[in-house]
Every structure is written in C-alpha cells, then in structure tokens.
UniProtKB/Swiss-Prot annotation:
The name this protein goes by in its record: Large ribosomal subunit protein uL1
Organism expressing this protein natively: Brucella canis (strain ATCC 23365 / NCTC 10854 / RM-666)
Family the UniProt entry places it in: Belongs to the universal ribosomal protein uL1 family.
Taxonomic lineage: Bacteria, Pseudomonadati, Pseudomonadota, Alphaproteobacteria, Hyphomicrobiales
Membrane-crossing residue ranges in chain numbering: none
Function of the molecule: Binds directly to 23S rRNA. The L1 stalk is quite mobile in the ribosome, and is involved in E site tRNA release. Protein L1 is also a translational repressor protein, it controls the translation of the L11 operon by binding to its mRNA.
Key word Kinase present: no
GO CC field: cytosolic large ribosomal subunit
GO terms for MF: rRNA binding; structural constituent of ribosome; tRNA binding
Gene label: rplA
Length: 233
C-alpha cells in the first residue's frame, strides 16, 4: 500500500490540479509522469454543455487522427460474397455473416471495431444488446455501415476514433501513446477537439466545451486551457 501511495504522489508531484495548462505544457507533464512499465495510452476527456438524455443533444462522430492511435485495432466485418472478399483483402481480422452472428451472439467478442454492409443490418441489428453497450454497433453516421468496406477497414486500422458523449456529458478517447513525440500528440488532440466541435448539436445552448483534460493510462489528469486546443464556441 505504501508503494502505491508513493507512486501516486510521484505522479501528482508538480501538477497543479487547479491550473489550466496550455496544451504543449500539459502534454509534457503527462509524458513526464507516465511511469508504468508499458507504453501508456494518452487519453483526452472533454466535458460538454449538453444533456445526452435528449436525442437532439447527442454528440457522436468519428475522426481520423493524423498520427494514428498507436494501438492495433482488430476489425470485424459482417458481409457476404464480393464484399466479404474485399474486407479480407483490406485486412479485416474477422469476416462473416450468419456464422459470425452466432459467435458474437454467444458473447465472444474478439475485435475492437465492427463494420457491416447495409444488407447485413437486419441480422446485425439483433446484436444490439451485445454490441450496443460496448459502443460497437455499426452506424452509418460514423461510417461503419457502408458498401465501401475496404475504405472502412483501412480507416479503422489507420487511426479512426469514434466518439460518443456519455450520460454525464463527457467524451473520452485515446488519442495516442506516451511514446509519440509531443508534436504528434498535439496534432492528434487538436484533430479530435476540432471533430467534437464540428459535431456540436444545434440544440446545445450556452458554453459547449466546459473543461478539457488529458492523462496517461495510469497517470493523473492535467487540466488544459480549452483555447489552446482550438476550442472556440
């Protein structure tokens, strides 16, 4: 227990939890305090002025990070015939139709992102209780219900990140690794923030982006000045 407390204190050391840091300084603090023995993910949290209980205030979208996420993304594709072959050639990890439905319906989820052709949605829609809570249900709004499965697979493998506001009005996402250089992390964060801003629902009134913070997987959150991530209401 003492070792854990010592580690936590070391991570927190030098971080003013009441200060808003500019993005560049915040990235430096996060990287300096990433002490885990693995390549931690750098995560962003954005508190938005929306109430997602109302359908017209839902914030959802997808963004292709310019420098990728640094993680290996396993992609499953529901498709038949030529589209199934296209998905395989594009590098999809799992491709199938009814047989894949049975596997997923049984609770075996061995992928991180799910794509489907439009004709497969009557079948895939029945997996709502399995895929929905995991944020994996294919949706045309984020490009995961499409006839261009090759492009969707390439995007998923290349750094596409889906985002969706949670009940408390917060959006979380992994936007890179602590091993990335500072400039690449900054580019990714700004690209993500810009996408969230562009997804602002017309029903959202008042201040849209209330708070922004970044952290590493095992690290402490560092508050970021929203203006330094190009956040403008």
């Amino acid at each position: 227990m003492a070792k854990i407390s010592k580690r936590i204190n070391k991570i927190r050391e030098g971080v003013d939890r009441n200060k808003l840091y500019d993005l560049s300084a915040a990235i430096g603090l996060v990287k300096e305090r990433a002490v885990a023995k693995f390549d931690e993910t750098v995560e962003i949290a954005m508190n938005l002025g929306v109430d997602p209980r109302h359908a017209d205030q839902m914030v959802r979208g997808v963004v292709n990070l310019p420098n990728g996420t640094g993680r290996t993304v396993r992609v499953a594709v529901f498709a038949r015939g030529d589209k199934a072959e296209e998905a395989k050639k594009a590098g999809a990890d799992i491709v199938g139709a009814e047989e894949l439905f049975e596997i997923v319906n049984g609770g075996k989820i061995e992928f991180d992102r799910c794509i489907a052709t439009p004709d497969m949605m009557p079948l895939v829609g029945r997996l709502g209780k399995v895929l929905g809570p995991r944020g994996m249900m294919p949706n045309p709004k984020v490009g995961t219900v499409t006839t261009d499965v090759a492009a969707a697979v390439a995007a998923s493998k290349g750094g596409a990140v889906e985002f969706r506001v949670e009940k408390a009005g917060i959006i979380h996402a992994g936007i890179g690794k602590v091993s990335f250089d500072n400039a690449k992390l900054e580019e990714n964060i700004k690209a993500f923030a810009d996408a969230v801003i562009k997804a602002k629902p017309s029903a959202a009134k008042g201040e849209y982006v209330k708070r922004v913070s970044i952290s590493s997987t095992m690290g402490v959150g560092v508050k970021v000045d929203p203006s330094t991530v190009k956040v403008v209401d």
